[in-house]
């Protein structure tokens, strides 16, 4: 969607979740939206790289009453806890931030993690800007952008509706080795391959998987979850 179209939608009072380049998000008016930076998208034609002038717009159902907020890295226990008893939460967190690391490692242990549905994504930057530009998230109600913390839309639904989360994954587990990890971390040294302690980097290289094009597909409560190598 063009910036003009997105701005018109914002001014209409619509509640939105947005994604796009930082320059595009900076140009939008204040309103009922949250956003994160990223130039990479999938549309009907396939993969798209948008570096300026357009944003990806996801409307939040009008039947829901939304509360938009930013939680600092020291407030993350409230992200799930403050979610509505009947509804869902949309969350966006900057890649590599303290909030990203903490939420990824600890959110699953929240008592409400499987009772209050939370969906979202990790904001990023163009690969050519890695190390030069930081991922951002935006709280549209104030017009602020942040390098850390999580922006959310807590969406309460009427009693006649129920939120259910499903995951669409184009990858499936193979029938090869089973890998298990004893530590929860973004960085891994050794893991267990079919029960035997093995250096992950050496294993990946020996299997010819160091091109990074295929993920590890894990089982999380019955759902197939990808972990990039």
Regions found by a protein language model. Give the residues of each.
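Small-residue-enriched flexible segments
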Residues: 1-23, 29-32, 38-41, 47-88, ...
